[in-house]
Amino acid sequence: MNTQQLKMKSAPVLPISCLIMGGTQLSRHYYVKGGIFFAIQVCFLLYLSDIVHTLIGLFTLGDVAQIRKGLTVIQGDNSIFMLVEGVIATIIVGLFATTYILNIKDARNSSYCHLTFKQQLYKLYEDKFAFIVLTPAFLASIAFIVLPIVITVLVSFTNYAAPNHIPPKNLVDWVGIKNFIMLFKFKIWSDTFLGVALWTFIWAICATIFTFSFGFILALALAKKNIRFAKVLRLIFILPYAIPTFVTLLIFRLLLNGIGPVNSFLNSIGMNSVDFLSVPLNAKITVIAVCVWVGAPYFMLLIAGALTNISRDLYEASEVDGATKWQQFKEITLPMVLHQVAPTLVMTFAYNFNNFGAIYLLTEGGPTNPEYRFAGHTDIFITWIYKLTLNFQQYHIASVISIIIFIFLSVIAIWQFRRMKSFKDDVGM
């Protein structure tokens, strides 16, 4: 049968797949594919009424509030549950629509099949192996990455906050961009946002640069041929990185508090106590210093490996040309190390930007700042969001801040990666 005859014969069958998914495939003896498409449609139709009801709930967020009559509580609509269920229903509809389109395309491209059912299973497994393997990861990504992001975005357009809009006691309403306007228009909120943003940038930049620099110094020192006990020193320097960060931060908090061992020692030698964690400037310097202590060993190992990849011929040639040690470092060592670790620096900056543990476990965002709204002097965005949600239930503003952080970090990371020579070299390979 030639192609023209096949098209003429298959043309009347195509409309079947517009009404019954898999109809064309089943009529052409593709029992496996046709059965899968048909089963998906049956499942979707069985739950269609529930899906429609859930989608309506996404737009209304509920109409009946909880009612209390004495000791009796009559439950109403839970707006947040309805929002989450509505998002899930929307994703299901989107996946079904995608499957429906794939069904139509497959129906147009399929000819008559002469394989047995077992052979069809084997062929489907061979042809769609990558799709089958990636499907669980794809669904997991939707559930654990896409779904939370979408919900966060939607919450930012609601009034989900204490004390008057916390389900199930109260309903939540859509408010548009009111929360975004409030964050930047109201002085108490805008001052807090700008203050926390400034400190977050200072913290992320200083923590990244100082950690990298200190690790670089350690790696260069241990790379010297005349240094004694290099292996022992390397082991000692690695210990802060080997100890769990959670434990290290709590130990430093214990050591540096007002009545901790460090201040007790200072008092014993006749010196005054130092408010490491209770004075704003001291607290900021302390959290950066502790971050350097924890992170420098990692960069030491990373840079030590990068140094071994630099050819000694470059240094020998530069010595012949009369280059000094500083010129060798400036023109050879530093550029070649940065070329290898630049992507890691960007990721470290993004990590420090959201480094919840380093701030919260040491200072809990303190000391308190009376000029800020629900934030302290050392709070960064992520710890401020934590307080807004867990302590004060201001979910609407927390969602707005989360969106801003997500957009900023995404843009910065993409821009930096695309500008890096290492990224361009990889793309050109």
Spell out what each predicted region is:
Residues N2-V13, L19-S27, Y31-G34, F38-L46, ...:
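N-terminal signal-anchor/first transmembrane alpha helix
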Residues Q41, I51, I56-V64, Q75-M82:
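N-terminal, membrane-interfacial amphipathic/helix-forming hydrophobic leader that caps
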Residues S49-L58, V133-M429:
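A structural signal for multi-pass alpha-helical bundles of membrane permease subunits
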Residues V64-I91, K185-L198, P280, N391-F392:
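Membrane-interface segments at the starts/ends of alpha-helical transmembrane spans
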